[in-house]
């Protein structure tokens, strides 16, 4: 079915007045936060909406050593990356705990493999649609040189050879 609207007519009788604050795109912010992990200096995102995925990325980024400051009122988020693999290793159990109820960990794999040479994908949560396999992600990561170091019931560990 194709919808082709060339004209939109609105008949109203009541003028609208006031102001509305519109926050940023909900699907962009978590990905922008993950991309900021690749940097070596702080990244500032503005107009950030208050979303559960922002919270999940914040927690996972902090467990990987990044510092995240988020002012919900102003919508300003500053993420300062830390490329220390020992922080992630110390927090592996918490990463597993927080990662399992979201699809966000798969987004973090690329930056983590690039910066600290290892990444863990816990068994991922999903949605009402059902299972969403990650084979195509794993195949792409293998083509970039990643190795599956461990694959068990709790998830997958990937590494980049030195």
Tell where the protein language model's regions lie, with residue ranges.
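Structural preference for solvent-exposed beta-strand-turn elements
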Residues: 1-162
């Amino acid at each position: 079915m194709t919808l082709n609207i060339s004209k939109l007519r609105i008949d109203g009788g009541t003028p609208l007045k006031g102001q509305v604050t519109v926050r940023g795109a909900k699907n962009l912010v978590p990905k922008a936060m993950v991309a900021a992990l690749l940097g070596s200096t702080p990244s500032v995102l503005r107009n950030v909406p208050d979303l559960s995925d922002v919270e999940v990325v914040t927690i996972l980024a902090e467990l990987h050593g990044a510092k995240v400051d988020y002012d919900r009122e102003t919508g300003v988020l500053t993420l300062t990356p830390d490329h220390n693999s020992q922080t992630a290793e110390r927090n592996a159990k918490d990463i597993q705990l927080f990662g399992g109820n979201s699809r966000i960990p798969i987004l973090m794999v690329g930056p983590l493999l690039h910066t600290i040479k290892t990444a863990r994908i816990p068994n991922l949560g999903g949605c009402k649609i059902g299972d969403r396999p990650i084979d195509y992600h794993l195949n792409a990561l293998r083509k970039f040189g990643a190795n599956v170091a461990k694959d068990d019931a709790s998830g997958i560990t990937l590494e980049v050879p030195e």
